[in-house]
């Protein structure tokens, strides 16, 4: 039997996934300081940016200095606050070849409606790197320029229900994590995954669950059922009001809409939520359910 031996490979060894691109580099010594910090999570498309922006305005209406940080490559978190898609931190860093010392605050911080300060962290190109690096660099830049010293509240608006170490990076800085959810199975299933991620992060960081924001839902029976089993509580409820959808289309927050009963109703709920968060939200010791248990709990009989 003739045996042909394959010649040894002479090509360079395979590079690790994401090599040469932006990678997560979290510095445990970089902390935000005295500001109250909230991270907003939820299923993709559930209305986190709309919720975050209106909450930021509500907090500013109560006299607080607010900074909203968008943590999504779409960089549209602060769209209704600034009325445009502002450049991201990653875009600005690339322009100076990642020499952060060359940046000025006005290069990456933009003032939005009612004085809310806005930053879009952005993210690496699709399929490469880790968004956690950008979050870490954003917080580092803000601290280096002493911008966090003049801030009372920081809102992180985080990409979808991605709970990898990178996009869970805001949890390193947050006091409380808020989950936006609708009254449907997919949204609650995603919420359960987020609960698991927060539980994991809480072993090393002070972040705790602050509650559920029910959104785009006339009823909350399914959310209530999950909350009871998991140990959560709904802290605000925004029904599927058409004025909320229209505000996004008009590039504005609810606090800029023409007065109407529905607008006033939504505004008052945001102001109530903002006041309760400032007063202090007791941490919730939620326990995530197993996937099978969620199907049994919320599935068809």
Swiss-Prot record:
One of its GO terms (molecular function) is metal ion binding. Pathway: Porphyrin-containing compound metabolism; bacteriochlorophyll biosynthesis (light-independent). [4Fe-4S] cluster binds at residues 130, 164. Residues 1-13 have a biased composition (Low complexity). One of its GO terms (biological process) is photosynthesis, dark reaction. ATP binds at residues 45-50, 74, 215-216, 239-241. Its cofactor is [4Fe-4S] cluster. Its EC number is 1.3.7.7. Binds 1 [4Fe-4S] cluster per dimer. Mg(2+) binds at residue 49. It comes from the Bacteria. Residues 1-21 are annotated as: Disordered. It is an enzyme of class 1 (oxidoreductase). PROSITE patterns: NIFH_FRXC_1, NIFH_FRXC_2, NIFH_FRXC_3. Component of the dark-operative protochlorophyllide reductase (DPOR) that uses Mg-ATP and reduced ferredoxin to reduce ring D of protochlorophyllide (Pchlide) to form chlorophyllide a (Chlide). This reaction is light-independent. The L component serves as a unique electron donor to the NB-component of the complex, and binds Mg-ATP. Homodimer. Protochlorophyllide reductase is composed of three subunits; BchL, BchN and BchB. Belongs to the NifH/BchL/ChlL family. This is Light-independent protochlorophyllide reductase iron-sulfur ATP-binding protein. It comes from Bradyrhizobium sp. (strain BTAi1 / ATCC BAA-1182).
